[in-house]
A protein has these predicted regions:
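Short C-terminal tail/terminal secondary-structure segment
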Residues: 2-9, 153, 232, 243-254
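Substrate-binding pocket helix/loop in short-chain dehydrogenase/reductase
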Residues: 104-105, 112-117, 199, 212
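C-terminal substrate-recognition "lid" of short-chain dehydrogenase/reductases
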Residues: 125-128, 220-249
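Active-site helix of classical SDR
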Residues: 128, 164, 172
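Alpha-helical segment proximal to the catalytic Tyr-Lys
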Residues: 133, 177-181, 240
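Residue(s) in the substrate-gating loop at a strand-loop-helix junction
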Residues: 148
Length: 254
């Protein structure tokens, strides 16, 4: 695992991560467990989630995995409550879960629109709403919503996904205003094209690598660890006066 700086403000804090079984989410889980945080993570992939939790069980706090379909808000609420009951009030929320499935305008139906909004936007609002009560009682907390550079780059082939991800940044600003009086920070972490196993398997072709080389200022591949580093900053006391902001980690593409 890549070595990260240690931040004592995260040790023993309860951190909730959505979509934590694979990809960027799995890296987030591993990174925050290494910080000594109490990590609970939710994902629909029960097999991958359980395997990750077992692999990291020897840490300062063994992580808790809860299998949940986050498009089902009742299931999301139950999952959050399970983490709360196991570890205590939630201090940090990382709203990572998403699905960038490609789709065409002409193939989009009202049902597929709703499905894409549910997996990319809706759960972020309701998770933030749920944990805000914990944070208010504690005198503060950090919520990190996950966006995407896709809409900034005018990417085609996934219009509902890009719409949802653009909306995430509006949600962040609204929640930052509403939660600010309670010392709850809300920011958006905006990844570029991150080389997860899924991206490498499905879309990172030779042409895709050429696009990266042309688009990014920094000529190296963007990895999940780069996103986790920014998440650590936004979750920790080091970002105590940062809220309502977009933190882009994309190698200089936007």
């Amino acid at each position: 695992m890549t070595t990260f700086a240690y931040d004592p403000s995260l040790r023993d804090s309860t951190v909730l991560i959505t979509g934590g079984a694979t990809g960027i989410g799995a890296c987030l889980v591993e990174t925050f467990v290494a910080q000594g945080a109490r990590v609970g993570f939710l994902d629909i992939d029960a097999g991958a989630g359980a395997a990750l939790a077992q692999r990291l069980a020897g840490g300062h706090h063994a992580p808790l995995f809860v299998s949940a379909d986050l498009t089902d808000i009742a299931a999301l609420t139950r999952g959050i409550d399970a983490v709360r009951q196991h570890f205590g009030p939630i201090a940090v929320l990382l709203n990572n879960a998403a699905n960038d499935q490609r789709h065409k305008v002409e193939d989009t139906t009202p049902e597929s629109w709703d499905d894409a909004m549910a997996v990319n936007l809706k759960h972020q609002f309701f998770a933030a709403k749920d944990v805000a009560a914990d944070m208010r009682q504690a005198g503060g907390g950090s919520i990190v919503n996950f966006g995407s550079v896709s809409w900034m780059l005018k990417m085609g082939g996934m219009p509902v996904y890009t719409t949802a991800k653009a909306a995430v940044q509006g949600l962040t600003r609204s929640l930052a205003r509403d939660f600010g009086p309670f010392n709850i920070r809300v920011n958006t972490l905006v990844p570029g094209w991150v080389m997860t196993d899924k991206q490498l398997r499905l879309w990172v072709t030779d042409a895709g690598r050429a696009d990266i080389a042309r688009g990014q200022c920094l000529q190296q591949l963007l990895m999940p660890e780069h996103i986790a580093r920014m998440a650590l900053f936004l979750a920790s006391d080091d970002s105590a006066m940062c809220t309502a902001q977009d933190f882009v980690v994309d190698g200089g593409w936007v």
